[in-house]
């Protein structure tokens, strides 16, 4: 959802996959969100933040407070339930908030598509019975 609303490339990695070489892509402009649920990898995630903080100032930890000794103003510490079957749902909610708030801060209106005629041009949606919600008049597009 963040990719759609912020309109920048976004991807997620398991921490072990990240260790295999993804870390090489981190630059000063990278924004890294860490989901540190309880378990074996939480300590390693915190250590990873220490290391990557040398490369980018944009590190955001989402976690329960247990085991987080040096929280920053960029961290979101929440008393999650941390149930192994439920925690995936808990950690989705903060990312949904980021997806909602970030475009506002960046001056992006996600309700306005980059190309209002994209689906007509590519033929990805049946547009025959739809109104033209953006009021776009384009003979080439409307003739598809």
Predicted regions and their residues:
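A SIS-like phosphosugar-recognition module
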Residues: 1-144
């Amino acid at each position: 959802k963040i990719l759609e609303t912020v309109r920048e490339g976004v991807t997620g990695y398991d921490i072990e996959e990240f260790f295999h070489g993804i870390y090489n892509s981190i630059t000063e402009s990278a924004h890294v969100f860490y989901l540190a649920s309880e378990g074996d990898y939480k300590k390693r995630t915190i250590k990873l933040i220490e290391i990557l903080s040398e490369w980018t100032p944009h590190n955001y930890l989402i976690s329960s407070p247990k085991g987080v000794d040096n929280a920053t103003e960029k961290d979101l510490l929440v008393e999650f339930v941390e149930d192994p079957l439920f925690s995936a749902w808990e950690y989705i909610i903060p990312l949904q908030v980021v997806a909602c708030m970030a475009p506002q801060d960046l001056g992006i209106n996600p309700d306005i598509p980059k190309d209002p005629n994209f689906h007509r041009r590519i033929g990805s949606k049946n547009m025959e019975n739809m109104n033209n919600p953006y009021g776009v008049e384009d003979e080439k597009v409307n003739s598809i």
